[in-house]
Amino acid sequence: MASKSNDFYFNAFVEQSEFSIQIVEKVKNIFENYNTINLRTSMDEVHLLEHTADIKHHEIMEKLSKEFIPPIEREDIVVLTQLLDDLTDYLEDIPILLYTYHVKTIDQAMMQFMDVIDQSVHQVTKLLSVFGDFKKDLTIHKYIIDINRLEENGDILFHEFMYKVFEEEHDARYLIGQKEMFTKFEGILDTAEDIANEVGNIIMKNS
């Protein structure tokens, strides 16, 4: 676990997750200072971050294609780096959906869901920051549990918010937009949970 080649993958996973933090912070800023006039510019800024994250993903895959003996199973590296890439992709979708569905305001439900997403993305980075030392670090399982708990919280919020929206609103376009937004939010938390579970599976196989 000490060679530079081994360190590359674990460090790269952290770098991928840090792009998700940058995007989620940008999206939070969009929510907190919501202005439809500036939305296209914000979308471009988020896309630039996502594109840079894509480059890191391709860098990992290129190195793996030339690697003789990777530190963990090749298939596990592929799955984990793809999940991390998916996370940045799904986060990028948030401002795109705001634009596509002409969302006029950010309500409390969206802010509350975004807070859970923010926590989950930060926990993913904390998890991956200790992943390279998984045989010694005792905090790793705490992060996995935390991410799973946040996903469960997201499920509860999703069902509560969707029930409320369909009970109170009757405009079809608004309902479609809200459903797409909340489904995307839930998908982001599901992906974070998939990352945590994949890390847990890798640890089990290598312990």
Task: Annotate the PLM regions.
Residues 1-207:
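Cytosolic, long alpha-helical scaffolding segments
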